[in-house]
Each structure stands twice: as C-alpha cells, then as structure tokens.
C-alpha cells in the first residue's frame, strides 16, 4: 500500500496514470499531463482531487452502504421507471448526508491553496466526477457522471463535490455499469477541482487524434464553439469543425485539410446567480458567421494533440488515439487542455470488413426524391422506423424499441432509450456531441444538427434515415428499400498490378482507405464542386456585379468568407486534400473539372456564364475551357487549390489530370497556365518529397485523359508534354464508334 492510498486529497502533480484506482481515469490523466507535459509547452490548469478513498470513507461513515445495497436488490435497468426510482432514492440519500468533517477540512485547505496559487480570494473552479473504471478502453462512460462549472467559494465547492459523488448513481451510470458488466461496488468516484479557464469570454471544444467517423488515424479532429465547453460536449450547438493531417504536420506543413463553419447559435457563460453559476445566451450574428479559431490556434492544438498521443502511446506500449477537451481563455487568449483520455469507440474497432449501404432514390416519384430533413451524418448505415418525438426526459418510458428518436439534444439521461432506438435525429449538436458519440458506440445511424427536425417530422410518421453518403445525413419520408453489402477485406488477394481506386466523395475517402489499394486512379473535382461549393466559379469571381437575390444565396453558402474567391479555392483544396490524405503517400490522381456546359449551368449563378449548346458532350468542355478568356480565371482557381494542397498541406502525392484534350497544342496552353500559377510539371514544391514504394515516381506529374481518337493517333506527341495517360473508355468508345452516350 502506498502513502497515497489513504489520502483524502491529492494534487495533480502527485498523481499519474498509474493511479486510476485512487483518482479515476479522468483525474489520473490530468495528473499525468500536468506532471509530464506542461514542461513541453502544453498548458494544463492546476487543481486538486478528492480521492476515491474519500468517497468510500464518506459512504461508510454516513451509513449509506447498506441502504444502496438494499435499493439495488430488485433493480431492473430495462424498466425505465424502476431505474429512475432506484437512482433518485440513492442520489437523494447521498446529498442529504453530511461529508465527514475531516474530509471537509482538507477540501477547504486545498481550495484556499488553489485560490492563493492563482492570486484570487476565491478561485472559480470546474468540479468534475472521475470514476475509477472511467476512460478505460472499452468503457467510455461518455458523460455518465456530472460536471459543475464556475463553482466559487468553499461552501459551493463542498456542495458540488457531494453532488458529483452522488452522480455515480445517475440512472445512466447505473444502466451503463450493468450493460458493461461492472460490479457497482467495485467502482468508486473521485472528484477533480480544477481552476477554470475563462473560456466563457473565449471559446472551447473537443479534439480527437483519430477521425471519429471512420477510425482513420492520420488526422486530428477539432470542434470549436464560443463560451464554455459544455455546449459542445452536450451537443447543444453545432460547432466549427477542423481536420489536420498528422504526417505532413509532423514535417512542418500547416496541414489544415478541412475547415467547416458551424451555426453556434448559443453559448454558455458565467452567471451572477449563485444558484445557477452558468447561463446560456445567444451568440451574435457576427460571431456565428466567423470561425472560432484562427489557423495558428488550430495548428497549436493539433501539435499538442500529437504530443499527448505520443506520450500516452509510449506509456501504453501500443497506439493510443486520444479524446481531449480544450479551452481558450478570453482574457489572456491562451489555449489550455482541460481533459485527455483514450478514445474508446473507433480505436477499438477492427477494420477486417467494410459494410456498404446504398439507397437509390432516383426511381421514387419526383416529390419523394428529396430528403425532408438534412443534417450531419453519424455512422454509415441506413435505418427505417416510426418517429417518436420526445422533448421531456420524464416521457422516456413511452419510447418503444425500434422507433426513431427525434429530439432537440440528448444527454446521458437519454441513454436507456437510445439503446433501443433504430436511429436518432437531433436538432442540435455536431460530430462529437453526446448523441453522436453514443450512436457510434451503439452502431446505429444518427443525423445531428438538423435545425428543423422537430417542425418537419411527426410522431408516428414512417421515415428512412440515410447516413451512407458522407457527411450529409438525409431523412426521407416513408420506408424505403436499400442495399447492404459486406466486403471481407481479409480475403482480398495480393496483386502484382497496382490496383488503384476511384473516389468520388472526399467524405468517404477515409473509410475506403482501409481497403487494400495502391492509391487513387481517379478523383473527380466535379464531386467536390457540386457537394461543397455549389456555386459557379465565375459567379464568385464576379460577385460584386451579381443581382442582390443571387448574392444573398451565395452569402449563405460562403459563411466565414468575405473573399468569395478564397471560398472556392479553400473548399476545392480541402476536398482534394482529404482524398490525398486518406491515401498518402500513394499517388492520388485528381482530374481538373470536366463539367459540360449544361452541368455547369446547374451551379448557382451558372446560367449567367454558360452558353446553350445543342450537344454539350462535344462542346465547350475539358482543356478547351481552361485557356478560353471566358473561363481562364476560373481555371486558375483550380490551379491555386491544387498548389495549396501540395505546398501548404504538404500532399506531394497529388497528380494532376487534364480531361478532354483535343490536341498537344491545346495541352501545352494548359500547361503554360499551370506553370504561371506555380504548378510546373516536374517541380517538387518547397520541400523534398519521398516517393512511396507504390508511387509512380517523384516530382509533380501531369497526366492527360485518353478519351479522344486523336489522343491515340498522336499518343507520342501527347507523351512529349505529359507524364502519362488515363484511359476514359466511355468517351473514347462513343467518339470512335460514333455513338452518343447521352442518347
């Protein structure tokens, strides 16, 4: 027995990850970081811990053990009313009891010492529960126990500590322990009392060193919103989301491969009301429409995330993706890490097979092809069922197995019915909200952050929830038929041929990267432009001259961007970058845009810049557009995007592909424009690129589509200026045989 085993109080610098049995997973991790990582520049606010021994001492001295044992004798967690009754009785008994004086005295002294350390009369603190089996792989305890923010004053700290201890017996915590096979009395609860970061005046969020949807391990995922972090953790807001690519970040590149702006309607701040120390307020329209973090802050957090992951990986002797909470002090503008724990959902999955779900709505009547609700997809599955709208937690017992839960947000109190739902839809929240985390753990589809599900759906309505299409989650009216196909990737044979993939949506790239491959043979820019940009490039280049109605529509799409051209470049670069990152360091062949005039016309503002052609298949398309004065500036934006991917993201594995190039002379004109924009064939950019074993060589390569008979007849001339061909069999067949593929 160590000298720490019988302590009521331990400080962060006295504990490490070896002390989970004494202080719980969350507090052990805080101690580990505070002791080992603050010296590396990672800021962690200080604090002290009321130990698990103190909890056990309190329960025993207050005579609560026999009462709890008696309450649990006829516990039935499948009976929600029974569960609620038992949990409430135990919690009330704990809160009514007095904390022993010997523990109170030590808490009081420690709180005074913490306040003095920060030169405050009474420090504002975060009081967090930490169970002794918490945050172990296989047991996420996602929000099962309580956190109290802006706890100020000795008396309030006493009360918060006691309520945190009582939260070991929350309904969801009891249910979770039963589901996971934990013995109730083998788990104790410690309480961390940590100096608050003034993120109420700044911002906060969560960070994962793994993609939370696919389990792809080479990215850092960061969510950010204004105010205190509980809004993000509880899923009460749709936050900004950022992705940073680890391998090239480690090489020194500012590799932010994705930035998406969230709605961030509300934030949590300090309140002057002593009974309610925090309150929710609306975020100003200006702050809703800007990114919470700048690039420097995103990169700082990502580097900290890598350092923390590296430390925990070395300590565990195996890969240890991490789940962290961060906060930015609005007074000092400093960033802090306030929690870190192992990620317990995706990191535990084995990627031996890929189940592909697909839903084809094209054969439905015209009125039913469009989704009735759209939000952020969680998972990749499809489910049908009857809607059950629940707003009040007291109505949970009315929910029936197989129904689809529709609500504003979820918190751990909802987990008993989430376990029996076929799908979940929420008005608010992002990919790291409570609803999203639990849905992934349960393996059911969810659509979060819809904004209008409660007004669009009705209880009893039959719907189909589709999360199989990347980041967008779609909800359709009625029960629709879908396909499900399982691919066992362990049985795929080794091949001598370099088998590359065709990738459409960047959002699916991380998942498909688990299939054995040698890179990407074709990634089309058109998919990125249609799904992420939606606006004709010339409309963005000529934004100021557009009519007011069109400008208003474009403003909604380009939130966060004053310069509309930057929006086009950034979103195109992000789409290319995600695909490049997913298959790095293997080659990823990206084809410049090959919309025909009728397809370009469907983009917002497109009709003003596209001619009407009788046969667009043979018209103004491919390379002929790129040097035409009417489109040349738009093509330069594509070049800027590709340059950004290679030189800023560090993804030198990107290969350019020119479509529908009729003559070598036309090809040379395109190459000249690319060179003007800093994309010179054979160039490597500002840093060395090590070609992988499966790469087709080093240096910036430019291929051309072989899809016109002239490409075949003049192949040697084309290969004098290009590095290779990609055969486009559809167009080559129609132009050779005189058939129209659109007829």
Q: What are the residue ranges of the model-derived segments?
A:
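N-terminal beta-alpha lobe that positions the nucleotide/phosphoryl donor
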Residues: 1-192, 289-294, 301, 309-313, ...
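Long, charged amphipathic helices and adjacent flexible linkers at domain junctions
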Residues: 72-75, 85-86, 107, 178-183, ...
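Conserved alpha/beta-domain cores
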Residues: 122-126, 131-141, 148, 186, ...
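Extended active-site and interfacial segments that coordinate phosphate-rich ligands
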Residues: 142-175, 202-273, 338-372, 420-427, ...
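Conserved metal-phosphate-binding beta-hairpin within the catalytic cores
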Residues: 143, 317-344
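Amphipathic alpha-helical
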Residues: 150-188, 281-308, 313, 334, ...
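Conserved catalytic alpha/beta cores of large enzymes that bind or transform nucleotide phosphates
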Residues: 219-323, 327-330, 362-384, 392, ...
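Acidic, glycine-rich flexible loop/linker segments
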Residues: 343-347, 372-404, 408-523, 527-544
